[in-house]
Structure formats: C-alpha cells, structure tokens
Amino acid sequence: MDSTTSAVATAALTPTELDTLVHAAAEIEGWAAGSHVWGHYAEQTDHGPAICRTENVSACRPDVRALVDGPLRAIATAHLGTDANAFKDKINYKQPGGAGFLPHQDRHAYPDAPDLVSLLVAIDACTEASGCLWIAPGVDHLLPTDDRGVVEAHVTDALDWEMVELAPGDALVIDGWLPHWSDANRTDAARRVLVASYAPAGSGYTRDGYYSKRAAEMAASTAADGRFRISTHADFAGEEVAPEHRAEGACSHA
C-alpha cells in the first residue's frame, strides 16, 4: 500500500478506547431512533428505513472527542507531518442492506482545504461482505468526475483497486487524493465506522467553519434539485430518506 496516500494503523485504539467508541455508537444510534435532530441521516433499505450516518458526533460526545483529539489526532499528525486539527467527524453505520459509496476523491468535497487526511476507524469488522473500502493508491491529482462528483467510469475502470479489510479498532488513513469506494453491506450485522478528518493546525480550516459551509451547500443542493443528500456530492449509492429536521451543530438528542 502506497504510504503517500494511505496506510492501515493496526490497533489504532486500545481495547478500552474501542469499548468507549462501541458504547458511544450504540447510544447515539439509540438517540437517533427517537429523534430526527442532531445530524442523523437515514436511508431506505430492503428492510425499511435505517440510520446510515450521524455527523459532528464529538460536538455532543466528550468521550468521542477525546478519541478524535487524542490517539486519532496523533496518527493524523504523523501522516501530515505537522500538527493536525479535526474539522469533521461522523459515524457511518452501514446497517444490513445499507448502501455503499461510488468511486470518489475526498478532495472534490473540500476544494478550498489545505492538505487533509481522514481516519476511517472500524467499530465493527470491515470485510468484503460487509462493504469495506476499496482504494486505488498512488493518485496525486484530481480525477475527472461526472456531475455527481463521482469519478468517471472510464477512469475508474483503469485504476488498480485494492480491498482493505479492517478489524475493530484498526484505522485506514487516507488523504484527499485517494480514490475509494465501497459496496453494500450483505451481512446481517451493521458495519459501523468512525470517520475523523483533519487539516494542518493553524490553516484556518475549522470545525465551525466546515459545518457552517456544509449546511449552506446542503440547503442549496436540495433547493436546486429537490433531492435530500447525506453528502455534499451525490456519491452515495443508496436512497436517502429526508428527516423532519437536521441540525448538525444543535447538540440535542431530546
């Protein structure tokens, strides 16, 4: 695996830290079942509507923030070669039957960001059957995309893809250039991951700034075509379910 674009940090979390994350994810999912506020997103599956994402998790969870700003930040700092600052975090749940994402590069979603790196931390085992990531290392430039922000098919077909399976507590570290995609979850259990994204500290790319801009972009995209999205680009392969409310910085689960 090309260390300039990706790396796997085996046992990125200690058993105690992983237990903390597992407990937090379960509790947050329980909050989502009773409320549509605080950045919860749902998708339609063959089993009915299911939660697929919660954004800005550490805004309401000091235990998750301690992981994002502690051991995970240390990994991001080592990869960036300078002090890292978290500007975004989310949990992707990928419930049974949950959809994956089409081939894309994160850099397209953050065109004004400086160098960035994201850590995808496995809460559950990420396997081929449960929809782990496929990556194409070695890319150091933006690839052409269609109007959804998805890498064009003829480019995708020419890339050398590698499957990355993770054990709980492992982390896949990726930069903004790395093309990646994932398949649907074909198992009978969730495939949850925490994704934390970092930029160099002092770069001006901050959590508040990112989520303010995201809210405006999401509202504009919905107004333009009437489609509710879970991402700023339309690279989600599933069918989103629009919530009654969305407030990613509201820090409320009541």
Named regions from a protein language model:
Residues 13-15, 92-94, 108, 126, ...:
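Short, solvent-exposed loop/turn segments at secondary-structure junctions
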Residues 142-179, 183-254:
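Conserved double-stranded beta-helix
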Residues 9, 119-121, 172-174:
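Short hydrophobic-aromatic micro-motifs
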Residues 89-91, 119-121, 194-198:
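A structural signal for short, well-ordered beta-strand segments
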Residues 1-4, 8-103, 109-110:
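Non-heme Fe(II)-dependent double-stranded beta-helix
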Residues 7, 50, 89, 116, ...:
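A short glycine-rich, His/Asp/Glu-containing loop-to-beta-strand
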Residues 98-163, 203-213:
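Catalytic core of non-heme Fe(II) oxygenases with the double-stranded beta-helix
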